[in-house]
Amino acid sequence: MTDVKKNENMTFEEAMKGLESIVSKLEEGDVPLEQAINYFQEGMALSKMCHEKLQKVEKQMDFILKEDGELAPFSVQEEDEGDK
């Protein structure tokens, strides 16, 4: 099991792989209760880490360069259901 506190500098992708591994182990259903709780706690920490990294990237993407070189808020346009 990975020590999340020691891996605060792990990448988003590494954290997601850790989450996938934990989910896989828990889905097997052959995990003692105490170990399942530890996996759950680690998964929650990894999930929080991923969420924080995504929020940071979202803030970075909130500003993009306009044609005149000024920073402007970035807005995502939702796809219409008919466009799919």
Swiss-Prot record:
Q: Could you cite one Gene Ontology molecular function of this protein?
A: exodeoxyribonuclease VII activity
Q: Which SUPFAM superfamilies match?
A: XseB-like
The UniProt record lists the EC number as: 3.1.11.6
Record's keyword terms, sorted: Cytoplasm, Exonuclease, Hydrolase, Nuclease
GO annotation terms (biological process): DNA catabolic process
InterPro entries (UniProt xref)? Exonuc_VII_S, Exonuc_VII_ssu_sf
Chief subcellular location = cytoplasm
What's an example GO cellular component term for this entry?
Answer: cytosol
This protein's source sits in the domain of life called: Bacteria
Tell me if Cytoplasm is a UniProt keyword of this record: yes
Tell me the compartments it is located in.
Cytoplasm
Q: Which reaction does it catalyse?
A: Exonucleolytic cleavage in either 5'- to 3'- or 3'- to 5'-direction to yield nucleoside 5'-phosphates
Q: Give a short account of what the protein does.
A: Bidirectionally degrades single-stranded DNA into large acid-insoluble oligonucleotides, which are then degraded further into small acid-soluble oligonucleotides.
Q: Which PANTHER family match?
A: EXODEOXYRIBONUCLEASE 7 SMALL SUBUNIT
Subunit-structure text: Heterooligomer composed of large and small subunits.
State the family it belongs to: Belongs to the XseB family.
Full protein name: Exodeoxyribonuclease 7 small subunit
Protein source organism: Bacillus subtilis (strain 168)
Q: What gene does the UniProt entry assign to this protein? A: xseB
